[in-house]
Amino acid sequence: MAAAVTAAVSLPYSNSTSLPIRTSIVAPERLVFKKVSLNNVSISGRVGTIRAQVTTEAPAKVVKHSKKQDENIVVNKFKPKEPYVGRCLLNTKITGDDAPGETWHMVFSTEGEVPYREGQSIGIVPDGIDKNGKPHKLRLYSIASSAIGDFGDSKTVSLCVKRLVYTNDAGEVVKGVCSNFLCDLKPGSEVKITGPVGKEMLMPKDPNATVIMLGTGTGIAPFRSFLWKMFFEKHEDYQFNGLAWLFLGVPTSSSLLYKEEFEKMKEKAPENFRLDFAVSREQVNDKGEKMYIQTRMAQYAEELWELLKKDNTFVYMCGLKGMEKGIDDIMVSLAAKDGIDWIEYKRTLKKAEQWNVEVY
């Protein structure tokens, strides 16, 4: 920490110590300190008394520049008590009839009033009241559309929502409040929106980056937003020339979300987009093990590890929390071959914004 010294020196008018003294401000570099007395200094052969004030100056603050597209990002523009009220424009089931559960893709109007970015989330406040007679609390959902929306006019926002229905320990069928509210919405219905929120999952700025996306189920939402911007849109300030590699894990092939869209992207940019599905109830690896997302990744383990050593590789993980441990297990053994502690290395990646996780 830098120090600044201001010295006030009291000197007699002459060499006589009986004469009055005067105080002068003297530059520190002109002072010669005498060992015989901490209070005395000599200036041009004259002895005087010094009073010095030492102040410290805080070091200049280092401004951290994010590697992500965070310029002018907006968060929490709309709160639960004053949400934005949009309308449902489109609500379509995107899973097959034999899929274990329903997933819906929905588009809401925003009229440009909810300025979100790829990788952010919005909150939804479902209609009605809870068992205590209070309004329902908001639920957060990852945005499934790019910043300009599915219609390309920056006036809509899209979600990918799985209908939650389960049987509790008492044998009662329980329906998730918000997911069922959303999946049942009809075009024209009003929907209360909060946010946008989140900076963890923002896209990298570098258009030449390697972006590895690991998603399960509706965790595909932020990656759809990334990939639309990369391959379906034209931007003057962004043209993706790197590698986007998507791993998507689902239980059945009828649960593969946005499959046709992703295949079109791969056809359009085969050198820049790689696509790998892991269908756990239908596929197995060469050991006969079910094909979970980490099982599929293990087939490319060495290649993935080499990519993770580069400072322009960014990993994004979104979906079920269970996949995180499976992926760590793969990386632990790979890193160990190079004498690297994976958990410590992952901390380094997180600090560098290269390992980004949003699981539930």
Curated annotation (Swiss-Prot):
Reaction catalyzed: 2 reduced [2Fe-2S]-[ferredoxin] + NADP(+) + H(+) = 2 oxidized [2Fe-2S]-[ferredoxin] + NADPH
EC numbers: 1.18.1.2
Cellular location(s): Plastid, Chloroplast stroma; Plastid, Chloroplast thylakoid membrane
Family matches, as PROSITE patterns: FAD_FR
Major enzyme class: oxidoreductase
Amino acids binding NADP(+): 142, 162, 218, 250-251, 280-281, 290, 319-320, 358
Pathway: Energy metabolism; photosynthesis
Transit peptide: 1-52
UniProt cofactor(s): FAD
Domain of life: Eukaryota
GO cellular component: chloroplast stroma; chloroplast thylakoid membrane
Result when mutating residue 360 to W: Results in a 2.2-fold reduction in kcat for the diaphorase reaction
Residue ranges annotated for the FAD-binding FR-type domain, each copy included: 81-203
Molecular function (Gene Ontology), one example: ferredoxin-NADP+ reductase activity
Record key words, sorted: Chloroplast, Electron transport, FAD, Flavoprotein, Membrane, NADP, Oxidoreductase, Photosynthesis, Plastid, Thylakoid, Transit peptide, Transport
InterPro entries recorded: FAD-bd_FR_type, Flavoprot_Pyr_Nucl_cyt_Rdtase, FNR, FNR_nucleotide-bd, FNR_plant_Cyanobacteria, OxRdtase_FAD/NAD-bd, Riboflavin_synthase-like_b-brl
Membrane topology: Peripheral membrane protein
Note, other: FNR is probably attached to the membrane by a specific binding protein.
Entry function: May play a key role in regulating the relative amounts of cyclic and non-cyclic electron flow to meet the demands of the plant for ATP and reducing power.
Subunit details: Monomer. Interacts with TIC62 (via C-terminus).
Stated family: Belongs to the ferredoxin--NADP reductase type 1 family.
Protein name: Ferredoxin--NADP reductase, leaf isozyme, chloroplastic
Taxonomic source organism: Pisum sativum
Organism classification: Eukaryota, Viridiplantae, Streptophyta, Embryophyta, Tracheophyta
Gene: PETH
